[in-house]
Amino acid sequence: MQTRNTFSSIKEEITRSISVSLMIYIITWAPVSNAYPIFAQQGYENPREATGRIVCANCHLANKPVDIEVPQAVLPDTVFEAVVRIPYDMQLKQVLANGKKGGLNVGAVLILPEGFELAPPDRISPEIKEKMGNLSFQSYRPTKKNILVIGPVPGQKYSEITFPILSPDPATKKDVHFLKYPIYVGGNRGRGQIYPDGSKSNNNVYNATAAGIVSKIIRKEKGGYEITIVDAANGRQVVDIIPPGPELLVSEGESIKLDQPLTSNPNVGGFGQGDAEIVLQDPLRVQGLLFFFASVILAQIFLVLKKKQFEKVQLSEMNF
């Protein structure tokens, strides 16, 4: 009986330990692993709002450039490259979730016209595969194959991302036509400042929640600070919690105002969006254009030959 109770106790301890470990893992790493563009996928049915704004800007507050390059025109059922460039200073280091410094990651969302989608592996040429590297793209939703996301991936290696795209064929997709279409892109480097629930990340400026005198600053063992602010008028105390990462700007005994920055801004990244246009070209129109050019060239040749023939006739008449 005692052996059975001992076994039950050991089993309970093991179960409790596993549960605690799992909770610690979720609390510690969830903000890191659920990085862009996963947040957008979880919170928004469509990444592009009616205003044209891409929702990634809700969490990545700094504005940074992004560039996209696509062919001017493509034929139906053809694989082509969409190259997204996310430039930034490779020497920069960002504040990680644990407060330490590390390299920047990048991510991108590519919003293609309806019918355009990620090219299947067997249609991608070796040249494009080499440019892609080890990237793994995914659809924003199973029902939205024209919206592709990637990231976070190391910015040092993938500040230029090549998407392999398959153009649609109007012969098999009746809702697709030979037209000029817009393509939208959003790209960011570095961690965001706001989580989807509205809470601030440690990649942010922290401001004073009250005015008064900084009476005490406690540096936490695992990083970060507890700042006690005392209102000189009524003696009320307010404690502001600063997570690991941002650098402190105030000191004990200093008089501060409401919303005054207590820390520096550690953010070195940001988000940008852009657009491009692509024409889905009708092969018959291309053939017609080539035929027209060929006919013009032939007409020019015939005119030159006719002119030379006429000159020979004139020359022979003059000699006669």
Swiss-Prot record:
Co-factor(s): heme
GO biological process: photosynthesis
Cofactor: binding details: Binds 1 heme group covalently.
Keywords linked to the UniProt accession: Chloroplast, Electron transport, Heme, Iron, Membrane, Metal-binding, Photosynthesis, Plastid, Signal, Thylakoid, Transmembrane, Transmembrane helix, Transport
GO MF, any single term: heme binding
Binding positions (heme): 36, 56, 59-60
InterPro entries per the UniProt record, alphabetical: Cyt-f_TM, Cyt_f, Cyt_f_lg_dom, Cyt_f_lg_dom_sf, Rudment_hybrid_motif
Membrane-topology descriptor: Single-pass membrane protein
GO cellular component, one term: chloroplast thylakoid membrane
Pfam families: Apocytochr_F_C, Apocytochr_F_N
Residues spanning the membrane: 286-306
PROSITE patterns: CYTF
Similarity comment: Belongs to the cytochrome f family.
Protein name: Cytochrome f
